[in-house]
Amino acid sequence: MSDYETILKGKYPAKDHAKRVADHIRSKVPGANGILYLEGRHTKLEEDSDHPEPFRQRRYFFYLTGCILADCHYIFDLKTSQSTLFIPPVDPEDVIWSGMPMTAEEAKEKYDIDNVLYTNEVNAELARLGKGSGSTAFAIANQVLDTVSFIGFEDKNFDVLKGAIEECRVVKDDYEVALTRKANAISTTAHHAVMKAVNTAKNEQELEAIFLERCFAHGAKNQAYHAIHAAGRAAATLHYVHNSAPLDGKLNVLLDGGAEWDCYASDITRTFPISGKFSKESRAIYDIVLKMQLESIKVLKEGILWDDVHELAHKIAIEGLLDLGILKGEADEILKARTSVAFFPHGLGHYLGMDTHDVGGTPNYADSDPMFRYLRKRGTLPAGSLVTVEPGIYFCSFIIEPYLKDPTHSKYIDTDVLDKYWDVGGVRIEDNLLITKTGSENLTPTIKEPEEIEKFVGSS
């Protein structure tokens, strides 16, 4: 049994998370007294239909409860540190169709919660806790039902709780890391299955079907995001969504896909040759991107400035594209002009957790510097944070052509050499890294060495 499987036999550490959030609020609001109040995602019907929308639990709620049930509420008493989960009571009409729901006793056994009551008791419990307390109810704006009353509380604060949870979510505990390892393990199985099938499949949607089937077969019914299965030049589209084009006549597939395990995401990208052998141009670009990733990973550790790691990746991209002749001129001048953004237009990576693009990254999408505008994490990395490292080089005519028309950039690009690379489409390699005090740990076991990929794909 894997170490992460042993950890996951325990309960999701909801009480520890609640106490961390409470301490954070006290640091922002000295002397804070009262309750934390959260609601899970409520059942919602599809438009013009009596069918419910696919359910996705609110991440703020899950962080303090570990509960994936719909229509639940939660209270944490700041004075006593007691947590109470409210679950839906038995609805006889619903039982006819859906069977018996979880009982309070079962919920208390399953979740790391002190008390479990039913949702028809929420207002009575709030009234009890607020009576004569002179305290504050901390909640999240626009996530409180109109039927919920905070009568008796001296104040209601809808400004602090959301940010407090987001800041606490940045640093993961062992259980959260174990969930991410599990998601990575399942996703790796799916990635490898697609690699094995790519030289016999007919189109992208076959590959997507294989990926989803492998995830589902291993218990991961939910994807962290809509996967990208992009063949040929479509790989130059960063978030390609069609996943339906034929594979015939194309060089490579870029697969960006990750399963979710108990609300925690994996986010993995691999690029591999459809024939089982990289073309000369594809291999050249792949080697540059792999170097970008490996050198970026080498410098990771607690306190590293993510902006600097992103810039390092650009410097390596420039060096590689100069060696190929796609770029020409002086490397420092090309970096200063930001011409490399034409080929590497996105950020090096982002925080990972319950959301694929997880909270706490403080990006600046208004940044006037195009090299940093789409960097989803700005600032230093703390130990315990999870980041993706996903450099890429792309040959997207829509992005590159404006650079070719701008003399500021066109003087650095050799169009005759560039023309040899359009069919490569794009290459991206993405792993999930745990930041430690002295370095990092790669949680993604998916193969990525080019010789190993060629052998793996070619042996199918």
UniProtKB/Swiss-Prot annotation:
User: Which UniProt keywords are listed?
Assistant: Aminopeptidase, Hydrolase, Manganese, Metal-binding, Metalloprotease, Protease
Query: What is its EC class?
Result: hydrolase
Q: How is the cofactor bound?
A: Binds 2 manganese ions per subunit.
What residues does Mn(2+) 1 bind to? 267, 390, 430
Annotated residues for binding of Mn(2+) 2: 256, 267, 430
Entry EC no(s):
3.4.11.9
Q: Name one GO molecular function term.
A: manganese ion binding
Catalytic activities: Release of any N-terminal amino acid, including proline, that is linked to proline, even from a dipeptide or tripeptide
Q: Which GO terms describe its biological process?
A: proteolysis
Query: InterPro entries attached here?
Result: Aminopep_P_N, Creatin/AminoP/Spt16_N, Creatinase/aminopeptidase-like, Pept_M24, X-Pro_dipept-like
Protein's name according to its UniProt entry: Probable Xaa-Pro aminopeptidase VDBG_02538
Species annotation: Verticillium alfalfae (strain VaMs.102 / ATCC MYA-4576 / FGSC 10136)
